[in-house]
Design a protein with these regions (language model features):
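Hydrophobic alpha-helical connector segments
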Residues: 64, 78-104
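Amphipathic alpha-helical packing segments from all-alpha helical-bundle domains
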Residues: 71-74, 87, 91, 98, ...
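Amphipathic alpha-helical segments used for helix-helix packing
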Residues: 99-119, 132, 163
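Helix-turn-helix
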Residues: 2, 14-18, 22-60, 64
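Secondary-structure edge/capping motif, primarily at the C-terminal ends of alpha-helices
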Residues: 80-81, 107-110, 165-169
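C-terminal peripheral helix-coil segments that are non-catalytic and often amphipathic
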Residues: 1-3, 95-98, 128-140, 157, ...
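Generic detection of well-ordered alpha-helical segments
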Residues: 9, 13, 17, 21, ...
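Residues at secondary-structure transition points
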Residues: 3-10, 14, 56, 60, ...
């Protein structure tokens, strides 16, 4: 049987994907500090050398994992926003909370990322830019700078609420309480955007 040989680019992409998958699983389950590059290499069925080749070091590998998670957030929020024209902020909150039910996602994005990559990174993240764009699109007269600041505030509030819900003894009750607050915040932003 004559099978087509994979190209160098295909092999590289597969290797990179295997490392990212292993890193995501281990960073998500054990956390950044308790995960070694040797474990990631073993989990991907490779030696440690490809990790250094493709990612440079552990921090850069973690940044790539975090970026993949951010892309997941943006894709999910974009798909959801199209279905929720009435109140996209509340809809985004619900969607984000669903993503945060995944313990790997929560550990990487909400717990380790701010500590490893720095909080200031959020200011330029695609998630914050999307939140600001949502505010500009749906919140009337809010100017660009106000939307950026509000976007960062919303991301911070959503992240903290998601952690609170996840750590609660009664997550369902905590989620309902957080959603009630999110409704009030969304309504207040709507009023503020119309008043400016």
């Amino acid at each position: 049987m004559n099978q087509r040989r994979r190209t160098q680019a295909e092999r590289r992409a597969e290797t990179r994907a295997a490392v990212l998958e292993s890193a995501c699983r281990l960073f998500g389950n054990k956390g950044y500090a308790d995960t070694s590059l040797d474990e990631i290499a073993a989990g991907s069925g490779l030696t440690i050398r490809p990790i250094y080749h493709y990612f440079g070091n552990k921090v850069q590998l973690f940044a790539a994992v975090n970026e993949a998670m951010e892309e997941r957030i943006v894709a999910s929020l974009q798909a959801n926003a199209a279905d929720a024209p009435k109140d996209p902020i509340l809809s985004a909150w619900r969607n984000f909370l669903e993503l945060c039910e995944d313990s790997e996602f929560r550990r990487i994005v909400l717990i380790d990322s701010p500590n490893i990559l720095g909080r200031e990174r959020w200011a330029e993240s695609p998630v914050t830019r999307m939140a600001a764009a949502l505010l500009l699109e749906y919140r009337g007269n809010m100017d660009q700078r106000s939307a950026e600041i509000a976007g960062r505030m919303i991301i911070g509030a959503l992240s903290e609420a998601a952690l609170t819900v996840a750590e609660s003894d009664d997550p369902a009750s905590a989620a309902r309480a957080a959603e009630a607050i999110a409704k009030r915040v969304s309504a207040a932003l709507l009023q503020a955007g119309q008043a400016e």
